Amino acid sequence: MPVIKVRENEPFDVALRRFKRSCEKAGILSEVRRRESYEKPTWERKRKKAAAVKRAAKKVSRENARRVRMY
């Protein structure tokens, strides 16, 4: 759990913004959304594999675009 110390004469809005930023960096909200409903292990593996395939295709696409620009 992210903890921030409110500084002397610090407005509430600024402290809240710092807290939100620290929560985002810690990945709390994404973790809560992920655990909101149960995901079967097979679905999780399928989702992760699809993401890996997408990343690989994106990487190849970038490499091809880089080669085209060199000539």
UniProtKB/Swiss-Prot annotation:
Q: Compositional bias (Basic residues) at which positions?
A: 49-59
Q: Does the keyword Ribonucleoprotein apply?
A: yes
Could you tell me the Gene Ontology terms of the biological process aspect for this record? translation
A cellular component term (GO) from this record? ribonucleoprotein complex
Q: Where is the composition biased (Basic and acidic residues)?
A: 60-71
Keyword match Translocase: no
Q: Name one GO molecular function term.
A: structural constituent of ribosome
Q: Which InterPro entries match?
A: Ribosomal_bS21, Ribosomal_bS21_CS, Ribosomal_bS21_sf
Stretches that traverse the bilayer:
none
Q: From the UniProt entry, list the residue stretches annotated as the region Disordered.
A: 49-71
Keyword annotations for this protein, in alphabetical order, are: Ribonucleoprotein, Ribosomal protein
Would you say which domain of life the source belongs to? Bacteria
* Stated family: Belongs to the bacterial ribosomal protein bS21 family.
Q: Which PANTHER family does UniProt cross-reference here?
A: MITOCHONDRIAL 28S RIBOSOMAL PROTEIN S21, SMALL RIBOSOMAL SUBUNIT PROTEIN BS21
Q: What is this protein called?
A: Small ribosomal subunit protein bS21
Q: Which organism is it from?
A: Colwellia psychrerythraea (strain 34H / ATCC BAA-681)
